[in-house]
Regions:
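Start-of-helix register in tetratricopeptide repeats
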Residues: 3, 37, 70-71, 104
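Structural marker of alpha-solenoid helical repeat scaffolds
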Residues: 31, 64-65, 97-98
Length: 114
């Protein structure tokens, strides 16, 4: 059931129905706050709305719960958009991403670490 809700929101985002996706995300309860897929979808909407830094914070929080390739890809894409090509490449590279993410989390004090 929960997966179906998230899949529906993913489809809305891909069909560029961003406002509808935001409404559907807001209907989800607090049990989703630690769900990495929910956080990824939130970040995707933030990215589309050009809220890059909140998207990054949300993605870094998502990594606290589950490491996921698409989360890393979106982080890389955002840093590329922001003009930080070097960090974008590090996050995209599976051999370098761990060090880059740890460094980011230590610099961004609002992100808790396990």
């Amino acid at each position: 059931m929960n997966k179906n809700k998230l899949d529906n929101i993913y489809k809305l985002i891909n069909n560029k129905k961003i406002n509808q996706a935001q409404i559907e995300l807001s209907k989800l309860g607090p049990e989703f706050l630690k769900n990495s897929e929910y956080l990824y979808l939130r970040s995707k909407i933030f990215y589309i709305n050009k809220l890059y830094y909140i998207a990054l914070d949300t993605l870094l929080i998502a990594l606290e719960f589950e490491e996921n390739e698409k989360v890393y890809n979106l982080i890389s894409k955002i840093y590329n958009t922001l003009g930080n090509k070097e960090l974008s490449k590090k996050v995209a590279n599976s051999d370098l991403r761990s060090t880059a993410i740890i460094s980011l989390k230590s610099e961004l004090t609002g992100i808790s670490q396990k």
